């Protein structure tokens, strides 16, 4: 009820486990399915997505634990942003339901659009899968509109935006960014 009544421009939900991409392979740790996230609770997950999709503002599900970073557009109003790993090896794409690096993907009842991800083919030795990424979330609700060059005058955007920026953990270089505008004026 709190989310539904919120007057915030954006709603953020944090989950310690992934929401849309499965962890069905264990590789070195476990050879069989070790999926222990929202991807095994289809009914509950669909109820959440359907409720969030009816919100007046975008809903961002921030997740981790899958050992890869990715951005998934679940619906026009619901997104998943995952960041990691920070201190352990990445997973092969085969450990994650044979998902593509980007594009359409379906695991369970709902097709999603993977906008970007770290993605590792299974011909890479596991000890070479150390590719940490981190995500910086920036909310732009004002912009500088000075009356004189070099001045400062902050003006509110009619529709603020959130920018999710993914950086390489080794080099600090920007790898991907996704911007989402508020849906209501």
Give the positions of each predicted feature.
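Long, structured stretches of catalytic cores involved in phosphate-ester chemistry, encompassing
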Residues: 1-185
């Amino acid at each position: 009820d709190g989310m539904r009544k919120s007057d915030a421009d954006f709603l953020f939900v944090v989950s310690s486990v992934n929401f849309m991409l499965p962890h069905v392979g264990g590789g070195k740790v476990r050879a069989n399915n070790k999926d222990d996230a929202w991807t095994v609770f289809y009914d509950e997950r669909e109820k959440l997505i359907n409720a969030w999709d009816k919100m007046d503002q975008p809903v961002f599900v921030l997740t981790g634990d899958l050992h890869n970073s990715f951005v998934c557009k679940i619906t026009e109003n619901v997104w998943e942003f995952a960041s990691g790993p920070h201190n352990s090896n990445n997973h092969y794409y085969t450990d994650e339901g044979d998902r593509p690096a980007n594009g359409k993907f379906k695991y369970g009842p709902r097709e999603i659009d993977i906008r970007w991800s770290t993605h590792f083919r299974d011909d890479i030795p596991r000890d070479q899968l150390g590719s940490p990424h981190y995500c910086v979330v920036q909310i732009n609700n004002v912009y500088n509109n000075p009356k004189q060059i070099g001045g400062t005058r902050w003006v509110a955007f009619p529709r603020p935006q959130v920018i999710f920026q993914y950086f390489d953990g080794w080099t600090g270089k920007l790898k991907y960014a996704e911007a989402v505008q508020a849906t209501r004026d």
